[in-house]
UniProtKB/Swiss-Prot annotation:
GO terms of biological process kind: tricarboxylic acid cycle
Name used for this protein in its record: Probable malate:quinone oxidoreductase
Family label: Belongs to the MQO family.
EC id: 1.1.5.4
Keyword Oxidoreductase carried by entry: yes
UniProt keyword annotations, A-Z: FAD, Flavoprotein, Oxidoreductase, Tricarboxylic acid cycle
GO molecular function: 2-hydroxyglutarate dehydrogenase activity; L-malate dehydrogenase (quinone) activity
Length: 502
């Protein structure tokens, strides 16, 4: 056993997009902070942040229909859509700041302009989409959105989807050109490259085994150095757990009261990836459909143009699966070990409540490849099985907790920050919109955990993120000004041609 002991101001657990974002923000705000990162794998961004483990959508509610619900009176509630969009704007502003200061280069390596399209079929769904369009089109954050139920126009927008489609059923779409495809794996790697220049101590192949308070009130992190097979102890005033699906088990080890009565339910994902370049060139958009009645939000089908390793790709999904692992590289015992005396009834209550989700997952797990192709053909009628392969995406651990509205054992479909009451410990749990909101979420961590520095740091935060503390939806002129600077910094011009099927 090693007797290595070190002390730092901040320890970040996990080398994904969340730790990358928090580390970058903190070093800009306080360059003298001593920060250490511990990552179990050999490289940054290999789990949930990896480009093959998520859909790469810059979630801004431009096309994701689950962010706009229909009220009982038939009107459309856009509050969640506006909130998600505002949060993504913070990320884009911070990335622009980093690019403008040459802290990261070549933004096309991690972000591309890409139209976002919502597609629905059936009279009721077309009516819903038309109402959604009318509710959003005059909002400054959704400026430029178009609606069409004209087949010829839809062929211009989505030639691959409309080719050989039966047009007897009503069909409609909205399109907005200000959407993006984001390679969060590439972005994470770029941010960690910059960590080397900022003096942040990054340790790969280091697995965190335990977290507890020592007699001095600091957090002591027990780390297994898998390179030398040694145990190390590192202390810090503040610890952030950004370990994806591995965050919940580590949070439980801290023993803080905020870690109690929280459970996690792992859901795995699969995508179909096109292997035919001719087909790939016929599509240039992220096209989101509508989840089937009774299906969970995670099941929304979408056909996505992706840019991975500088190469254009085409993916369809997601299809859900089940594994008790909390990470792709996790253990089959992760789920079982996460059940504690304080969350047992929370987990059991969720099991009783979420029978439809259980049924959905069982149905998804037993799907054959040809059944998946049938779902794909609802998007691409002429899809050929030989042109598509299966890729296994990342694990997502959905948060289960007791809430006032939902009662005991309520499943949460979202991203959640858990902070200790003294502000020395924070963890990031949950799933979508996840990485898209990284800057918003990490600012929340800073506000909750470093309140004594906020007044001092606020001018720098506003330099990095001009709309910090301001609702862009209520300041359209500021939004226009910021949008112009973002497009210039990140090179967000949508000029990609499509090949029309012959």
């Amino acid at each position: 056993m090693s007797n290595k002991h070190t002390q730092a101001d901040v320890i970040l657990i996990g080398a994904g997009i969340m730790s990358a974002t928090l580390g970058s923000l903190l070093k800009e705000l306080s360059p003298n902070l001593e920060i250490r990162v511990f990552e179990k794998l050999e490289n940054p961004g290999e789990e949930s942040s990896n480009e093959w483990n998520n859909a790469g959508t810059g979630h801004s509610a431009l096309c994701e229909l689950n962010y706009t619900s229909e009220r009982t009176d038939g009107s459309i509630d856009i509050n969640k859509a506006v909130k998600v969009n505002e949060q993504f704007q913070l990320s884009r502003q911070f990335w622009s700041y980093l690019v403008n200061r040459n802290l990261i280069r070549n933004p096309e390596d991690f972000i591309r302009a890409l139209p976002h399209i919502s597609l629905v079929q059936g009279e009721d769904n077309v009516t819903f989409l038309r109402k959604r369009f009318k509710a959003l089109v005059n909002h400054p954050l959704f400026n430029g959105m178009e609606f069409s139920d004209d087949n010829e126009k839809l062929k211009e927008w989505m030639p691959l989807i409309m080719d050989k489609r039966d047009t007897n059923e009503p069909i409609a779409a909205t399109k907005i050109d200000s959407g993006t495809d984001v390679n969060f794996g590439a972005l994470t790697r770029l941010l960690f490259q910059e960590f080397d220049h900022k003096g942040i101590d990054v340790n790969y192949n280091h697995s965190v085994e335990d977290i507890k308070r020592n007699s001095e009130g600091l957090w002591e992190v027990k780390v297994h150095d898998m390179n030398d097979e040694k145990i190390e102890y590192h202390t810090a005033k503040f610890v952030f757990i950004g370990a994806g699906g591995g965050s919940l088990p580590l949070l439980q080890k801290t023993g803080i009261k905020e870690s109690k009565h929280i459970g996690g339910f792992p859901v795995s994902g699969l995508f179909m990836v096109c292997n035919n370049p001719e087909v790939i060139e016929q599509h240039h958009a992220k096209v989101y459909g509508k989840a089937k009645v009774g299906a969970p939000p995670m099941s929304v089908p979408h056909l996505d143009t992706r840019f991975i390793d500088g190469k254009k790709s085409l993916l369809f999904g997601p299809f859900a699966g089940f594994s008790p692992k909390f990470l792709k590289t996790g253990s089959l015992f992760d789920l079982m070990h996460s059940v504690k005396s304080d969350n047992l009834f929370t987990m059991l209550s969720a099991g009783m409540k979420e029978l439809p989700l259980t049924k959905y997952l069982i149905q998804q797990v037993v799907l054959s490849n040809e059944k998946r192709m049938e779902e794909l053909r609802e998007f691409i009628p002429n899809a050929q099985s030989k042109d598509w392969d299966i890729v296994i995406a990342g694990q997502r651990v959905q948060v289960i907790k007791d809430t006032e509205d939902g009662g005991k054992g309520t499943l949460q479909f979202g991203t959640e920050v858990v902070c200790g009451e003294d502000g020395t410990m924070a963890a990031l749990l949950g799933a979508s919109p996840g990485a898209s909101t990284a800057v918003h979420v990490m600012l929340e961590v800073i506000q909750k955990c470093f309140p004594e520095h906020l007044q001092e740091w606020e001018p720098k935060i506003k330099e990095m993120i001009p709309s910090y503390g301001i609702a862009l939806s209520e300041n359209p002129e500021l939004y226009k000004e910021i949008e112009v600077s973002i497009e210039k910094a990140l090179g967000l011009k949508n000029e990609e041609p499509m090949v029309i099927p012959s």
